Design a protein with these regions (language model features):
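Acidic, glycine-rich active-site loops and adjacent beta-strand->loop/helix elements
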Residues: 85-88, 132-139, 177
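Solvent-exposed alpha-helices and their adjacent loops that cap or buttress functional pockets
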Residues: 53-55, 68-75, 98-100, 120-124, ...
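A glycine-rich helix N-cap at a beta->alpha junction
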Residues: 146-171
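Alpha-helical metal-binding/catalytic segments enriched in His/Glu/Asp
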Residues: 81, 91-132
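Active-site-adjacent substrate-binding region
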Residues: 176-320
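Conserved active-site and cofactor/substrate-binding residues in soluble primary-metabolism enzymes
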Residues: 28-32, 54-57, 76, 102-105, ...
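Short acidic, glycine/serine/threonine-rich loops at helix termini
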Residues: 93, 139-146, 182-185, 266
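Soluble metallo-hydrolase cores and metallopeptidase-like ectodomains found primarily
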Residues: 14-91
Length: 322
């Protein structure tokens, strides 16, 4: 193993491997993942199956309560971690776990680690809510050389099930490899998006990224199109910022990336080093944010923008009929 791997495969690699073994199955269900997490320790876990024609998906929500979190009657901030994807598999067109599943893999690995930490006495100050979906038989769109990934549910349903009103800030983790915009193996973060405004990069989040990777932070820019809802007829790089259309909380996209474009339905394209690094970053953000030591945006500056230029929340809607 190279020095690169020796230095970076640590903290969450066990959880990543365990979760991957669960997800890499044509028969995996939300109930199976729930049982796995419950065996780790205390957490409030709910699973909801939604059927759409011949396809279905299991949405899973994990609430890991903090010692001073809202669920305990406290006042510490609540972080949301959303694992975004169309599906973890594209069967029968493609055999096995697909690259698009890395958002779920990251989010569930973080949940497993936080539950284990709590069992061992390391309890975060505030609550963490982890949401994702599991669909091993996601629909695809015919395309050469490989089919595109689809989803058994529409974006409105996905947002309704994965964006919880208790989330006071959200990390949206999504495989973002099928483009020529981000050209690095690992992960990259977006600017903060809040109520139609694309704000500057959070210096606190950049600091966490530098500390956990030991490297200069990688970022990617988002467009106005990316922060509008799916289905409005304009181009979106992917669904990574779609949670921002369904909440007033600040959202940061966390993109799992590669140097070269890779299709979401590609198999054998998930890199454990990159997934672990992304998950570890999200866990450290959870520690800092729920302790009140990490901000996603400058509140005073945001209010100044709204006073000077007005609200931009219309960008969270489908827009005018034309």
């Amino acid at each position: 193993m190279s020095n690169y791997c020796d230095r970076r495969i640590n903290m969450l690699i066990k959880q990543v491997m365990e979760v991957f073994d669960l997800l890499d199955s044509a028969y995996v269900s939300g109930g199976e993942v729930k049982n796995y997490l419950q065996n780790k320790g205390d957490a409030d876990i709910t699973v909801k199956t939604i059927q759409d024609g011949t396809h279905s998906t299991d949405f899973i929500k994990i609430v890991i309560s903090g010692k001073n979190g809202k669920t305990a009657g406290g006042s510490a901030p609540t972080l949301g971690i959303v694992g975004r994807l169309g599906g973890i598999g594209a069967r029968p067109e493609v055999t096995g776990y697909v690259s698009d599943g890395d958002g779920a893999l990251c989010a569930l690995a973080v949940a497993a680690k936080l539950i284990e930490m709590k069992t061992k006495g390391d309890v975060l100050e505030g609550d963490v809510i982890v949401c994702t979906q599991l669909c091993p038989h996601a629909p695809t769109q015919p395309h050469e050389p490989v089919p595109f990934m689809g989803s058994p549910v529409d974006m409105a349903t996905m947002n309704r099930e994965e964006v919880d009103e208790a989330m006071e800030a959200i990390l949206s983790i999504d495989t973002t490899k099928g483009n020529s915009i981000i050209n690095v193996n690992g992960f990259a973060i977006s600017q903060t998006v809040k109520e139609g405004y694309i704000l500057r990069y959070s210096s606190d989040i950049l600091d966490v990224m530098q500390r956990t990777t030991g490297k200069a932070p990688h970022t990617f820019g988002v467009s106005m199109q990316d922060i509008t809802p799916y289905g409005n007829g304009v181009y979106h790089v992917n669904s990574i910022l779609q949670p921002a259309t369904a909440t007033g909380a600040p959202v940061i996209g966390v993109a799992v990336t590669t140097e070269q474009p890779v299709a979401g339905c590609a198999t054998g394209a998930s890199h454990f080093v990159d997934v672990e690094e992304t998950a570890r970053f999200a866990m450290e953000v959870a520690k800092a944010f729920t302790a009140g030591k990490c901000s996603f945006y400058d509140q005073a500056e945001f209010h100044l923008l709204e006073k000077k230029y007005g609200k931009m929340s219309h960008l969270q809607t489908m827009g005018a009929d034309i």
